Amino acid sequence: MKRTYQPSKLVRKRRHGFRARMATASGRKVIAARRARGRKRLSA
């Protein structure tokens, strides 16, 4: 059986990267929430 996690740097960046987050209103909310918490890494 194939495992569910098949790592790919490109897919990771496209789905969870900073630019992907900034592209939607809810994504911008995610970034804002992570900034408010003081996260060192905002996105993938």
From Swiss-Prot:
<comment type="similarity">
    <text>Belongs to the bacterial ribosomal protein bL34 family.</text>
</comment>
<dbReference type="GO" id="GO:0006412">
    <property type="term" value="P:translation"/>
</dbReference>
<dbReference type="InterPro" id="IPR020939">
    <property type="entry name" value="Ribosomal_bL34_CS"/>
</dbReference>
<dbReference type="GO" id="GO:0005840">
    <property type="term" value="C:ribosome"/>
</dbReference>
<keyword id="KW-0687">Ribonucleoprotein</keyword>
<dbReference type="InterPro" id="IPR000271">
    <property type="entry name" value="Ribosomal_bL34"/>
</dbReference>
<protein>
    <recommendedName>
        <fullName>Large ribosomal subunit protein bL34</fullName>
    </recommendedName>
</protein>
<dbReference type="GO" id="GO:1990904">
    <property type="term" value="C:ribonucleoprotein complex"/>
</dbReference>
<keyword id="KW-0689">Ribosomal protein</keyword>
<dbReference type="GO" id="GO:0003735">
    <property type="term" value="F:structural constituent of ribosome"/>
</dbReference>
<dbReference type="Pfam" id="PF00468">
    <property type="entry name" value="Ribosomal_L34"/>
</dbReference>
